Amino acid sequence: MTTSAEKLAKLEQLRKERAAVIQKPTTQVSSEPVVTEKPRVRNTAYDSLAGVTIGKRASRKWSDADIKSIPIYDVHQVPAAQVIALGKDLLTQIQNNSVNTVTVDYCLVLAVSIPKPAMTSFEHLLTPPSPEQGTRLDFTQPQAGVSNRSGLTAIEKMTLNATRKNLLTETDEEKRARYEAIIKKMEDQEAGLGTSKATVVTSETEAAAYGFLAATLLKLYAKSTESYVAGLAQIRNRFAAWYDCPKAVLDAFQPTEAALVSLRAAFARRPEVLSTWTLWVAVNENRTPGLLVTQQGLLNYLACQQFAYPGMHAYTLLIEIHEHTGMKFSDLLVEMDCPATRAGVREALELIRDYEITKDHPKRTTYFRYARNWDPKYFGALQSTECKTLVYVAASVSKKVSAQGANGDPMEIFAIKNLDATIKARLDPVAENMAGKILDQMLMDEMSGASWATKASTQ
């Protein structure tokens, strides 16, 4: 029999064994990833695509040799009487909202036929592109109440010019009326105006009004109808500044927004008209001898400001920051550089270094400024929709360091209006810091007075 002592000993042994099992450490599962001894291998499967861009991101470099391949219409300038005939038909079509493809042709012919400002007689402002500039497309010159032109002989032209000069100095009303009748008859003959559809030619200044108005309408290629209507008062005032004559034609021009929408849609269907107009503009901006200051100012207003650097807001903002603050481009581009902006910043570097007219390169041409009107792939890395981060930061900095004036708020640029709040929250401090640094460089150097060292918020 088992004694009590043996039973107690056995129970004690079981207790010890159980305690040993409970106290035995359990295996812990590590939350850290298992690091193998094998070295990591770089994935090279996609290396062949490292330098590939497709679609809108493809960027093309401009060369002046490309001018010869630009498709343009074989359009011809017309004299004052025909400008008036076409101009009246143009305004009638817009007024009646009967816009069609011929209306677009009217605008082009009238724009290229615009006369020089501040002249006492009608002379075309623009020189046509040479045969080597552009690839000609067939174009039918529009006719408006005009029969076949009969023209004037050399003697008749001399008579017409002499009569115009006499009219300028004549004070006798009877003689002035006679001179005006002679001029009207000869201008009608020069333009080939028939008797059944004769167009009354009031003066050459009226021709200036139609040419000017047509050129402003071509701005609808790049601006909204709302913006055009809002700027009509300024258009009338600017015409009066360049042409010393009544602006009755412009005052009478009261287009409906519906008609302008139709015209803008008609323009969109004819991109070759824009190619033609901008090449005429670029040729005259670069011609030798150049335009007079007043003439270039007129061309700047009508076309250069609207069609230079199209869709390249980041680049024009960088130029504006440089001009307003004096910050060196080398410093400015360094500040703007990051992985998200690098393609656009590098493109800006190439534009400034290789294309722009500078102190070291005063003889360069400016055709590159209009290149994106001819092919949107030129300088594609600076297209606003392709470099929104750069546009946003440049716009924010520009707003903080320069006066906006008539150019409006750069933060209203369409490409950045709908940026998500998350990225804006990340970019705003960048712009704030950058603006402060630019202002420091703008206001402080070793010779600045002590007061300039006071820093203020750029907000």
From Swiss-Prot:
Tell where it localizes. Virion; Host cytoplasm
* InterPro entries xref list: Rhabdo_ncap_2
Please tell me where this protein is predominantly located. virion
Has the keyword RNA-binding been applied to this entry? yes
Q: Per its record, what are the GO molecular function terms?
A: RNA binding
A cellular component term from Gene Ontology for this protein is: viral nucleocapsid
Superkingdom in the source lineage: Viruses
What keywords is this UniProt entry annotated with? Capsid protein, Helical capsid protein, Host cytoplasm, Phosphoprotein, Ribonucleoprotein, RNA-binding, Viral nucleoprotein, Virion
What is its biological role?
A: Encapsidates the genome, protecting it from nucleases. If expressed without protein P it binds non-specifically RNA and therefore can bind it's own mRNA. Interaction with protein P abolishes any non-specific RNA binding, and prevents phosphorylation. The soluble N-P complex encapsidates specifically the genomic RNA, with protein N protecting the genome like a pearl necklace. The encapsidated genomic RNA is termed the nucleocapsid (NC) and serves as template for viral transcription and replication. Protein N binds protein P in the NC through a different interaction, and can be phosphorylated.
Q: Which family does it belong to?
A: Belongs to the cytorhabdovirus nucleocapsid protein family.
Quaternary organization? Homomultimerizes to form the nucleocapsid. Binds to viral genomic RNA.
Q: What is this protein called?
A: Nucleoprotein
Q: Which organism is it from?
A: Lettuce necrotic yellows virus (isolate 318) (LNYV)
